[in-house]
């Protein structure tokens, strides 16, 4: 699979060079987009930015807004997912102005919603809420029930992060009511997961467990990462209530899903959580085996928690050594 991907990338690079040599703008634009798509499919979104920026520069020469808008939005999404909030906002703002000029309220509502996510990422809560409400107003005027519910969910997230829990619960409740009416199972599962997380942070373990179970019952197999996140949360709650076997079962199911989808970063989080349970049960060797996997992933992906995870490994190792010494 990797070899095929490398061959495709080499082929697209050759196409780009030919298009540049012949000054074929249309072919160059198509090849740059293909390259960006390949990088995204390979799980290398950062590398997709360079060809998209070149593509946007080409499109700017003709000022064709219809072709510029998708590129601006895609670039904005890539920057946003990497924490490049300011870049994302600038790109979204340009796209939104073009959408407004074209009278495309549906697209505007979606873009303004993305701007709210960027403000939320920057912890600019008031700006995030203002932007979400602008998107909400547009979506309500368009009769977009699923979109309205999503924005109420996002507003709930902001309120939860501000520790305004009653306001968060109210927003999540509005989101769920609309999602149930619209039979939006995916949206319901997402809002229920956020509700569960809110109860979890408040130490309301029973409520969190109920919400996680409701969330998982609605989730299909087509979204393994969301399902794994809910299972990881459920595992944490079970651990807090003393159900260590249940916690490990939830973590193991989450780990299977993440490993199957190649999500190494989130796999390391679940492995770490499992290791802590084995440490709590004085199962030092099992804990060390799991922490070795965590550290291996940390090194492979350059994770900033490597030093901290190595300290956990040494702590557990010292407990094993102490147990050995006590039995000698």
Where do the model's predicted regions map?
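Conserved alpha-helical positions within TPR/SEL1-like repeat arrays
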Residues: 27-41, 66-81, 106-121, 146-161, ...
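Alpha-helical linker/edge segments of TPR/alpha-solenoid repeat scaffolds
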Residues: 275, 280, 314-328
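Short coil/turn linkers that connect adjacent helices within long alpha-helical scaffolds
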Residues: 21-24, 60-64, 98-104, 138-144, ...
């Amino acid at each position: 699979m990797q070899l095929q991907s490398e061959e495709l990338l080499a082929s697209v690079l050759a196409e780009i060079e030919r298009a540049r040599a012949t000054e074929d703008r249309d072919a160059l634009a198509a090849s740059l987009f293909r390259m960006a798509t390949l990088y995204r499919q390979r799980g290398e979104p950062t590398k997709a930015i360079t060809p998209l920026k070149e593509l946007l520069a080409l499109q700017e020469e003709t000022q064709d807004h219809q072709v510029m808008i998708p590129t601006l939005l895609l670039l904005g999404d890539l920057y946003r997912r990497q924490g490049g909030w300011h870049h994302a906002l600038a790109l979204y703002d340009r796209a939104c102005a073009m959408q407004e000029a074209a009278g495309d309220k549906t697209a505007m509502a979606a873009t303004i919603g993305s701007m709210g996510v960027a403000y939320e990422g920057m912890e600019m809560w008031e700006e995030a809420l203002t932007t979400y409400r602008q998107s909400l107003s547009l979506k309500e005027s368009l009769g977009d029930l699923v979109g309205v519910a999503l924005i109420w969910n996002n507003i709930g997230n902001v309120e939860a992060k501000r520790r305004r829990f009653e306001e968060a619960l109210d927003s999540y409740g509005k989101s769920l009511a609309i999602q149930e009416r619209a039979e939006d199972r995916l949206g319901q599962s997402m809002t229920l997961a956020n509700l569960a997380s809110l109860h979890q942070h408040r130490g309301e373990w029973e409520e969190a467990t109920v919400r996680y179970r409701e969330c998982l019952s609605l989730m299909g197999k087509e979204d393994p990462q969301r399902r794994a996140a809910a299972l990881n949360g459920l595992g944490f709650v079970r651990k807090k209530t003393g159900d260590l076997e249940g916690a490990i079962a939830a973590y193991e199911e989450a780990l299977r899903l993440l490993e199957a989808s190649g999500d190494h970063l989130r796999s390391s989080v679940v492995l770490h959580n499992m290791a802590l349970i084995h440490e709590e049960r004085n199962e030092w060797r099992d804990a060390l085996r799991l922490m070795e996997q965590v550290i291996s992933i940390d090194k492979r992906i350059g994770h900033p928690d490597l030093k901290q995870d190595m300290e956990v490994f040494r702590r557990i190792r010292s407990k094993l050594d102490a147990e050995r010494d006590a039995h000698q």
